[in-house]
């Protein structure tokens, strides 16, 4: 399951790994694309939907918190990873942007309770070394 705010690159990541998420607008329903589960970004952005997010995560083996390196804030509250009884990984996207601050994004994910944090540039595609390492970690 890929969890993150709107625009962090969750759907692009799934597409880069060779699985096509459903086309169209981002719905307010959980989407399935191959082995990936994509809950709506609103589940993360609105605390009222945390129960739905936790319930959706019950069927998943691995959760991935996706943080955009260009954002100055994070939607992940401190210690949020401890809410789940699954393996939780962190993923920093958009590290090549001029406004990127991967150290800050790493601090956000560490604050959420993650130890395993990967940085990938989705635009490089599935053949990049970072993307291959991340794919090995989640599968």
Where are these regions (language model features)?
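N-terminal secretory/membrane-targeting helices
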Residues: 19-23, 53, 63-65, 103, ...
